[in-house]
Every structure is written in structure tokens, then in C-alpha cells.
């Protein structure tokens, strides 16, 4: 089980300056030394490098685009197999109701339970309906990761209306809820923990210096 506390997302896509499994392992080490209780990471290669560097539970994902589908976070059994090989403690996958490129969500959950019975599963959702569906399927954790990042939730931010969407999710499911997406300040982190989430994933506000720099620059341009 993931501990209560701060999970730091250590990810850099191929077009980003810090794209490197070695760099992500050092980012994870910095997060560990700062008090993080877990890491969220993308790709088998990054996860293996991170697990060689820090003794923290890892939420693993594989981001891969597929034609004719907007689902890209651990979309098929191919990505699941890569994550099983990485020996991450938790596999996270897109649990939205969008069209998937291959297996159904139900089939993927069954696949993970069969092939990796000791690995926990996290649902990345965008709506309360999707959270309820994930709970029905028996996900161990339900994360607000994709709220604001789907075509039908675009423009919505997790912290709007004092985290009302997060409150709605917490009231709708019995599973452990993870706050993720637009938790961008220590005060926001404290607020979501006070609301009763199991843990919170923070990424860009900690591990994406390019984006952090842009925020400083843009404040003078606005």
C-alpha cells in the first residue's frame, strides 16, 4: 500500500530538456531526500533506474499514443507488461470512459489481477462517473489525474471552488483517493490532505524547471 503523504511525479517526455532515465533517477533521489513517500514515473526504463536509486514505492505508467484513441496512459496490455517487468508497486492507467485502442478497461483490470496479483492498480479519472466506475471495477486507488485534461473536462482545474470536484469524488467512492493534477503549491497540498485524500501526486511544480521558469517570466509579461 502507498503511504500517506507526498508522491512526486518524476517524468520528462522526449521533447523535454530533462528526458533521461539517469536524470529522472536523480530527480527521484532529490524528492526522496526532501521527504517524498513515493514516486510516479513513466516508462519501464525510468522506473528501473529510479528503483536502483531510491527505496520508495513507484506508481508506474507508460505514455504511448495510439491512432483513433485519446487514451495514452497505460492504454493496452503491452504497456501493462512493460510495467510488470519494471516491478513497480502500483500500475496506473487511464480509467476514463473514452474509446480505448485495444482491450476494455474491465479486461485490463482482470489482466493485471491475473498476471501481477501483488501489484496495486490506480485509476486516472476525469469525472465523478468515471471514479464510480473505477470503484466498481475494484481499483485500489482513484486519482483525479485527468480532470481538466480530457476533451469533456478541458479548462477545469482541480483547485477550483475549493477543490469541489475532489470533494465530490471523495463522497462518491470508498476507494483510496489520490489528488493529482494542478496541486501546485504547498498550501494546495495541505488542503487536499486535510480534505481526506490518501496521498497527493505533485509533478510540474517540483520537477519541471522549464515550466517553473516560464511562470516566473510570464508574471512580468502579463
UniProtKB/Swiss-Prot annotation:
A GO term from the CC aspect: cytosol
GO terms under biological process: carbohydrate metabolic process; N-acetylmannosamine catabolic process; N-acetylneuraminate catabolic process
Signal peptide: none
Reaction catalysis annotation: an N-acyl-D-glucosamine 6-phosphate = an N-acyl-D-mannosamine 6-phosphate
Pfam families: NanE (PF04131)
A molecular function GO annotation: N-acylglucosamine-6-phosphate 2-epimerase activity
Pathway assigned to this chain's UniProt record: Amino-sugar metabolism; N-acetylneuraminate degradation; D-fructose 6-phosphate from N-acetylneuraminate: step 3/5
UniProt keyword annotations, A-Z: Carbohydrate metabolism, Isomerase
E.C. code: 5.1.3.9
Top EC category: isomerase
Its biological purpose: Converts N-acetylmannosamine-6-phosphate (ManNAc-6-P) to N-acetylglucosamine-6-phosphate (GlcNAc-6-P).
Family to which the UniProt record says this protein belongs: Belongs to the NanE family.
Full protein name: Putative N-acetylmannosamine-6-phosphate 2-epimerase
Source organism per UniProt: Staphylococcus aureus (strain NCTC 8325 / PS 47)
Taxonomic path: Bacteria, Bacillati, Bacillota, Bacilli, Bacillales
Gene: nanE
